[in-house]
Regions:
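Membrane-interface helix caps and helix-loop-helix hairpins in membrane proteins
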Residues: 30-35, 57-60, 83-93
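Interfacial helix-loop-helix junctions of multi-pass membrane proteins
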Residues: 83-94, 140-225
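Alpha-helical transmembrane segments of multi-pass membrane proteins
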Residues: 48-52, 73-78, 135, 139-146, ...
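Cytoplasmic-side transmembrane-helix entry/capping segments in multi-pass membrane proteins
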Residues: 40-42, 61-72, 95-98
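N-terminal membrane topogenic signal
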Residues: 1-17
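Short, highly charged, low-complexity non-transmembrane loops/tails of multi-pass membrane proteins
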Residues: 239-260
Length: 262
């Protein structure tokens, strides 16, 4: 209980600091006249309230450890990534966030299926491995849907959500001068766009590498959480790390106490 209380206090402190930084960012963007970034800041403040909103409205307790990760993830994606251009300044920033996203989406999927698994309304009890597998599939589905969204925004609205990637060499059947169905290795030093030569040190890939990289790291994040979930279900209540990261279904007594507090 003391450890959990300490986590809650730390979560509250982190949330207060992040909220203050977001408010300062919103004010700054307003005076700079950058209303798009100001809107992103306001959206961030709204997203900060989502975990506690779900905690109150659903019969689920979001542990302080997981909520802290969610808050830092939102801040890193919107304020640091978008407004402060960390996606451009730090090449691996996008990779870090997609890995974290895979982890978080697996946590959400785990909570959803575990809620059904522990409900008295359902007679079927699922094994820890099936619950973890569902969490993994849920995370990967969300990751794929996000890549669909990025492609759609780039294709229909002329954005660049699927970041460019410099590929120094390619293996291609199309470029084989013999016409045989055998790929040949081609080193690429420059490319020509509308008659203008760009010495980028490679071929400019406009989305395939970025998409596959995002899905691979999403896979890694989902696998990591799924393993944690299996250990948690097999030793429910014993693992401190797992308990601090996995949403839990509240009992009827806990739900009644929560309702009274509100």
């Amino acid at each position: 209980m003391k450890a959990n209380s300490g986590l809650k206090k730390n979560r509250t402190k982190i949330q207060m600091v992040l909220t203050a930084l977001v408010i300062l960012s919103v004010v700054r963007q307003f005076f700079l006249g950058n209303y798009h970034n100001m809107f992103l800041g306001i959206l961030t403040l709204i997203l900060f309230m989502v975990p506690q909103f779900l905690d109150r409205k659903l019969n689920v307790t979001i542990p302080p450890g997981l909520e802290t990760v969610i808050l830092i993830f939102i801040f890193s994606a919107e304020i640091l990534g978008e407004i402060n251009a960390f996606y451009v300044k730090i090449p691996i920033w996008d990779t870090i966030l997609h890995t974290t996203n895979g982890f978080l989406m697996a946590a959400i999927g785990f909570a959803l299926i575990d809620l059904f698994n522990r409900s008295d309304r359902f007679s079927i009890k699922m094994s820890p491995y099936f619950v973890a597998f569902f969490a993994f599939c849920f995370s990967m589905t969300v990751g794929v849907m996000w890549e669909f969204f990025e492609f759609s925004m780039d294709w229909f609205f002329g954005l660049d959500m699927q970041k460019d990637w410099i590929v120094p060499a390619i293996n291609s059947v199309k470029l084989n001068p013999t016409g045989a169905n055998v790929p040949i290795h081609v080193d690429v030093q420059s490319l020509v766009v509308n008659g203008e030569t760009w010495n980028l040190g490679g071929y400019l890939d406009i989305g395939i590498v970025d998409t596959m990289k995002d899905l691979i790291v999403n896979f890694i994040g989902a696998v990591v959480f799924s393993v944690i979930g299996i250990l948690y279900l097999r030793n429910r209540g014993k693992g401190k790390l797992a308990a601090s990261l996995i949403p839990q279904v509240r009992s009827k007594q806990e739900e009644e106490l929560s309702s009274r507090d509100q």
